[in-house]
């Protein structure tokens, strides 16, 4: 379906092959094809392009998120002897009856915040816990590791 054929309404429009886990969508929102969104909020009148991967994030109203954007990528435990996920997914490997839940809770607590009326360009990456201020623009391919003030324009690696 072409974007010009979509008619938005109070009910969010979710394109095919999208996975939503513990996520709230506002009115007149559109979620692009093949997105994965987890532990997040997409407020009214905001949209995502195709192939976005968003975790642990709140997104304000009228936000424009281009294709292939990554927000809130989860980290590996670099303070441990190994970076491999067997150290916190020990149940998966048969090492324990349970996974390292405090590690997962700590990951989920690092909320990325995207303000109202923002534009996140194609292929941008926004790290966990970063705030993008209202009206800010994040250029295509930018890697954002620290907060962006309202109405700022950022490009490349900052």
Show where each model-derived region lies.
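Conserved sequence/active-site signature of Rossmann-fold short-chain dehydrogenase/reductase
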Residues: 70-71, 143, 153
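Conserved functional loop/turn residues at catalytic and ligand-binding sites
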Residues: 58, 146-147
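Flexible glycine-rich beta->alpha loop in the catalytic core of nucleotide-sugar glycosyltransferases
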Residues: 76, 142-143, 149
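Flexible, glycine/small-residue-enriched loop-and-beta-strand segment within the central core
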Residues: 2, 7-130, 158
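Alpha/beta-hydrolase-fold catalytic nucleophile elbow
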Residues: 66, 139, 155
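Catalytic binding pocket for nucleotide-activated donors in carbohydrate/polymer assembly enzymes
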Residues: 148-158
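Short-chain dehydrogenase/reductase
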Residues: 119, 137, 153-154
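A generic "structured core" feature
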Residues: 133, 137-139, 143
